[in-house]
From Swiss-Prot:
Transmembrane segments: none annotated. This is Primary amine oxidase. It holds the Pfam family Cu_amine_oxidN2. GO terms for biological process: amine metabolic process. Disulfide bonds join 162-183, 344-370. Topaquinone (TPQ) is generated by copper-dependent autoxidation of a specific tyrosyl residue. Homodimer. The keyword Nucleotide-binding does not apply. Residues 226-236 have a biased composition (Polar residues). Cu cation binds at residues 467, 469, 628. The modification 2',4',5'-topaquinone is found at residue 412. It catalyses: a primary methyl amine + O2 + H2O = an aldehyde + H2O2 + NH4(+).
């Protein structure tokens, strides 16, 4: 039995925010919110409506995207104010390939009818379906030239698995749905991505579902399976380093409430949505102002709009690997079920959702999202020794709310968190794990390297290829209303030349309001600046405009030339921050159709309109990037590599909003006495 003192110290980290406590309630039966994800019944209704028009008996029909058609913002805001008086019809946007043509279909579920049905004639194709990829990866295993290549390498065909990779666009005039197929050895390890079969080019046509291009160029060694297994059941002692168990105890239950997809916690309220392309969507984030006695809107909607992953190997083996994980594979379709007590702590609450197959059938995705509280840090503190004969110590415990989901696209796992703080901050973060993209080589030691490998030798015969991860967040701020502005406050050095001070210099600030979208293209560098979205129509008691500041992630800038084909498609990474006039249809930074796209429908193209953004409904886009130079510690599976940014209130409140917040009090463990 631990001592009482030890127990109290341990209980200090108990995740019970008693000052804002509410018992959790996950309510399965609730009034549907206009932004709720599609239900099983809605997916089935969409499937039926489309198949009634295009019977599968005489049409080749595949659903590539089924998602909520965003309601008009003013309708949603009126619903928030008067939910019983405002009725918003559920409209569903469908992208389907029917007889080799891409259809954009809008369905009104209230009247169970197709409102519009248009054919996309431009460049690019929709998200790849899981079904067609599953068929394509089997093609090499029955393809005689590939079977001959396997025999030539002395490999066992039954121990080979293949994977599909989008091909991008490199100036070709043809507009055909093709993928590259790379194959790997699964013999003696499930860690297939570290055992590539190098030197073979395989291209498959997804519409014809056959191999249309094949080259066996050269033979490189297949990296060994030794020390690559990551399944604990396949590993043997010694294990380590040893970790001791940590237990959290919430005797009065969690401090948050879930009603359908709406979450209340501490002073925050927000909605959790889900989309087969975007994955998790945070909407209608409002915070309660204790002094003003009302909730105040901060963020109308936020999600990851795109993830651009360009590899930096220009050779035949890798040049095409310039992936757009959201637009080509779907963040929602790639979301995985969270593992209780591993991906999320024991006290987490889980939310299920649905995605769809290529034939439109809904697929239950259990534990897609988890919500939990965790001890954060110190909320605020001060020790005052300046008053004679008095010693003053004040400190407050910080407990934060986390909303988490994990997206696994091929070899990489993306842990996506939205962290809410009672102090008013929202902190989105990304943590990467998974497997490096490995290129096989005959080189076993660094001393053998005679040319640029385009990566690092992380193990014998294994090159971890240089690459980037560029996430772009869509952040539709509504600071106390829809009319906002974007301000850049630069910190300027001032020299004192008149001898009025013993100092020779100081710094001050200079604020500029971006008038147009061009003014709001920001490259974050060495020059310090504050980037703030303000409501110019509402001011604090002392006259400051209320606002929220972006504390950006550590900046990463694209290193490809602007005329390189991948960078043309990923031109939204040219700046770290963009601000655009709100347009309901401008959701995807890489364009609606990303596979084989040509960069003609991206954030970089939209902003050429140079629309006015002063005192308008505006959207901020923040690029969060990581230049990944692989290291041996990333092999055979990499520990989490994380980055984050913060949306922090700036003159939004009259004073510190958590000044009167009480720390969670110590509680007794069951079965233990004080």
């Amino acid at each position: 039995m631990a001592s009482t003192t030890t127990m109290r110290l341990a209980l200090f980290s108990v995740l019970t925010l008693l000052s804002f406590h509410a018992v959790v309630s996950v309510t399965p039966l609730h009034v549907q919110h206009p932004l709720d994800p599609l239900t099983k019944e809605e997916f089935l209704a969409v499937q039926t409506i489309v198949q009634n028009k295009y019977p599968i008996s005489n049409n080749r029909l595949a659903f590539h995207y089924i998602g909520l058609d965003d309601p008009e913002k003013d309708h949603v805001l009126r619903y928030e104010t008067h939910p019983t008086l405002v009725s918003i019809p559920r409209k569903i946007f469908v992208v389907a390939i029917i007889n080799s043509q891409t259809h954009e279909i809008l369905i009104n579920l209230r009247i169970r009818s197709i409102v519009s049905d248009n054919i996309h004639n431009g460049y690019g194709f929709p998200i790849l379906s899981v079904d067609e990829q599953s068929l394509a990866i089997k093609l090499p295993l029955k393809y005689p030239p590939f079977i001959d290549s396997v025999k030539k390498r002395g490999l066992n065909l039954s121990e080979i698995v293949c994977s599909s990779f989008t091909m991008g666009w490199f100036g070709e005039e043809k507009n055909v749905r093709t993928v590259r197929l790379d194959c790997f050895m699964k013999e003696s390890t499930v860690n297939i991505y570290v055992r590539p079969i190098t030197g073979i080019t395989i291209v498959a046509d997804l519409d014809l579902m056959k191999i249309v291009e094949y080259h066996d160029r050269d033979i490189e060694a297949v990296p060994t399976a030794e020390n690559t297994e990551y399944q604990v059941s396949k590993q043997s002692p010694p294990f380590g380093p040893k970790q001791h168990s940590l237990t959290s105890h919430q005797p009065q239950g969690p401090g948050f409430q879930i009603n359908g997809h709406s979450v209340s916690w501490a002073n925050w309220k927000f909605h959790i949505g889900f989309d087969v392309r975007a994955g998790i969507v945070i909407s209608l984030a409002s915070i309660y102002d204790l002094e003003k006695h009302k909730s105040r809107r901060v963020l109308y909607k936020g999600y990851i709009s795109e993830l651009f992953v360009p590899y930096q190997d220009p050779t035949e083996e890798f040049y095409f690997k310039t992936f757009f994980d959201s637009g080509e594979f779907g963040f929602g379709l790639s979301t995985v079920s969270l593992i209780p007590n591993r991906d999320c702590p024991p006290h987490a609450q889980f939310i299920d959702t649905y995605v769809h197959s290529a034939n439109g059938t809904p697929i239950l995705l259990k534990n897609a999202i988890c919500v939990f509280e965790q001890y954060g840090n110190i909320m605020w503190r001060h020790t005052e020794n300046g008053i004679p004969n008095e010693s003053i110590e004040e400190s407050r415990t910080e407990v934060n709310l986390i909303v988490r989901t994990i997206v696994t696209v091929g070899n990489y796992d993306n842990v996506i968190d939205w962290e809410f703080k009672a102090s008013g901050s929202i902190k989105p973060s990304i943590a990467l794990s998974g497997i490096l993209e490995i290129k096989g080589t005959n080189i076993k030691h660094k001393d053998e390297i005679k040319e640029d490998l385009h990566g690092k030798l992380v193990s014998a015969n294994s090159i971890g290829i240089y690459h980037d991860h560029f996430y772009i967040y869509y952040l539709d701020f509504d600071i106390d209303g829809t009319h906002n502005s974007f301000e850049k406050t630069s910190l300027k050095t001032v020299r004192i030349k008149d001898g009025s001070s013993k100092r020779k210099s100081y710094w001050t600030t200079e604020t500029q309001t971006a008038k147009t979208e061009s003014d709001a293209k920001i490259t974050i560098g060495l020059a310090p600046a504050e980037l703030v979205v303000v409501n110019p129509n509402i001011k604090t008691a002392v006259g400051n405009e209320v606002g929220y500041r972006l504390i950006p992630a550590i900046p990463a800038h694209p290193l490809l030339t602007e005329d390189d084909y991948p960078q043309i498609r990923g031109a939204f990474t040219n700046y770290n921050v963009w601000v655009t006039a709100y347009n309901r249809t401008e959701k995807w930074a890489g364009g609606l159709y990303v596979d084989h796209s040509r960069g003609d429908d991206t954030l970089a193209v939209w902003t050429k309109q140079n629309r006015e953004i002063v005192n308008k409904d505006i959207v901020m886009w923040h690029v969060v990037g990581i230049h990944h130079v692989p290291a041996q510690e990333d092999f055979p599976i990499m520990p989490l590599l994380s980055t984050s940014f913060e949306l922090r209130p700036t003159n939004f409140f009259e004073r510190n909003p958590v000044l009167k917040t009480l720390s969670p009090r110590d509680v007794a463990w069951p079965g233990c006495s004080n």
